[in-house]
Amino acid sequence: MVPSNLTIQQFDGTAWIGVVPFHMEGVMRRPLPDLPWVSAFPELNVRTYVERDGKAGVWFFSLDASNSLAVWAARRFFHLPYFHASMQVVAQGHGIDYRSRRKTGNAAFEGSYEPVSQPYASTPGTLEHWLTERYCLYAESSDGTIVRTDVHHRQWPLQKARAEIRRNTMLEPLGVSVTGEASLLHFSRRLDVVVWSPEPVGGTRPYLTSP
């Protein structure tokens, strides 16, 4: 699930998996223009937290999106495990109702969530800062090379959140069953991100690893 030459990070002895639903807007590659029917779409990713050569980043187990062109481009140019999904995002008051079902297989998510605090910046050394303030992602190319994509963003404007999760089978392809309430919930209204092109850092074919 994670390449053997990436280290799964732990916070106070615990490794974390995140399920992150959101909506993308303004996705474009300079100098191409922003085309709303191409560059705006829902996305849901399943991630864990890794490092290579001392550089902390994110490893995606899966990324689901409703835009088939975006799925193709992300697989082709960023080597990311994108999947095409049927998705619906509806604003409800201050919150969101979010539904996603992968076109193939049983991976699905349904839930409603909303913020319950004012926005704030996480404090260095805390779990929420460790989870959110990451500035690269790792992926594996078709020949087994590990690639790193650097990203830039301002610090996340986080809000505490509550959620009603009606269905979450996003981890079943990993052999993980999710029951009970989420261990940690956050909400963010908006974050602008700049993404660089992937760069090889060396690698091998993946092996199952555990922290």
Describe these PLM feature segments.
Residues N45-P211:
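Internal, well-folded beta-alpha domain core
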Residues M1-L44:
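Glycine/small-residue-rich interface belts in oligomeric ring/scaffold proteins
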